[in-house]
Structure formats: structure tokens, C-alpha cells
Design a protein with these regions (language model features):
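Extracellular distal adhesion/interaction modules in secreted or cell-surface proteins
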Residues: 1-199
Length: 199
């Protein structure tokens, strides 16, 4: 396999970043589309714009940001997209049908960078009607842990509903096994046709 030697963006560069969350605790299909958000950090303005893009779970999912002012609940993912938690939004078809929603901007102080601070965004999942029956979905905080969320530089085409990420991105399992190998850093550059959502 030829190495992908695309330049790796600086973590404080003004560019979009995508976080894709997967509820691995319950009914995991490993499509990494249960909640998809886009971040646009602007270090000069010390702000990060947050956009909600997709909801591929029928559980109630609350987007949180643990920033300089403490933990903020930014809203329920389906409701932010104008839908209900009983439906999939922008995951069943090959092209999005619901417009993305810019939630707003959160404080992003100097010293924050995506590589170390994207994990400040996480999903709280509420099970049924029990307000205390919740799980958290976060980016891995150390190597070797089962990924519950992926951080991708730039715009990302997430797998369609029920499509395993391995079927959409064939290099992904190699990257997941050893993310230090340059050969696999561009795993998200060549999705399998028909298996992903475009916009």
C-alpha cells in the first residue's frame, strides 16, 4: 500500500474539523454517524463555531462542551436539527436531506488546539425516560481504547446508516490498529462509492 503523504494540517489552523460519535454501549453498528458535528476553531477570535450535521441514533443525545466557563449543554442533537429522537437525520440516504444547523460559537481560549481539546466536546445519551440513565460518548483519551468518536481533519463523508465503517473506509482498521504509521493517516480520503453520505 502506497503511503499517503498529504500534509498534516496544523491543529490551530482555521479549517473545519469533524467529530463523529458512535454509541458503542448499545446496539453498535459501527457506522460512526450517531451524532456528527463540525468544529471551526478561530484562535485569533478565541471562538469555535459548532455545527450539527447528522443524527444516526434514536436515543436522546445531548451535545456538551466542557470549556473555560464549565460544562455547557448545547442542546439535543435531533432537536437542534429540527427533528425528533425517533428518527434518523442525514444518515439513511446517500445525500443529506436536512440542512446543517450552526449552534453558535463557544469560547476557545488561546492555548486550546484541536489535537488536545476536541475532547471537550462530548455526547450525553439519555436512555428512555430515566433522566439519570445516561452514557457519555467521548473521544478516546489514550491509545488502545475502543473508539467511541473519531476526529477528522476537514469535511468528512460519514457512512450511511447501518454501514460499518470498515465497509466504507477500508484503510480505517489499519489506522485504528496503529495510528502512528504515516501510510494510514489519509484513511478517510477514499470512501467506498455508495456507502457514505455526501453534501
Amino acid at each position: 500500500m502506497e503511503p499517503d503523504l498529504q500534509p498534516i494540517p496544523e491543529s490551530d489552523e482555521v479549517m473545519p474539523w469533524t467529530i463523529a460519535f458512535e454509541d458503542v454501549a448499545r446496539n453498535a453498528d459501527f457506522d460512526f454517524n450517531d451524532a456528527v458535528i463540525k468544529l471551526m476553531p478561530d484562535p485569533k477570535k478565541e471562538l469555535c463555531t459548532v455545527t450539527v450535521m447528522a443524527a444516526g441514533s434514536k436515543a436522546r443525545m445531548y451535545l456538551h462542551y466542557d470549556g473555560p466557563d464549565g460544562d455547557q449543554n448545547l442542546g439535543e442533537i435531533h432537536e437542534l436539527l429540527g427533528g425528533k429522537s425517533t428518527e434518523f437525520i442525514n444518515t439513511p440516504m446517500s445525500i443529506v436531506s436536512t440542512p446543517f444547523v450552526e449552534v453558535g460559537s463557544v469560547k476557545w481560549p488561546k492555548g486550546y488546539n484541536v489535537a488536545t481539546d476536541a475532547g471537550r466536546f462530548y455526547i450525553e445519551i439519555q436512555r428512555g425516560t430515566c433522566e439519570e440513565c445516561t452514557d457519555m460518548i467521548t473521544l478516546a483519551d489514550s491509545p488502545g481504547k475502543m473508539p467511541q468518536a473519531l476526529l477528522v481533519a476537514g469535511e468528512w463523508k460519514w457512512p450511511k446508516e447501518g454501514t460499518h465503517i470498515f465497509s466504507t473506509y477500508h484503510i480505517f482498521p489499519y489506522w485504528a490498529k496503529d495510528a502512528t504509521k504515516v501510510n494510514y493517516w489519509g484513511w478517510y480520503g477514499s470512501p467506498t462509492s455508495g456507502n457514505y453520505v455526501t453534501y
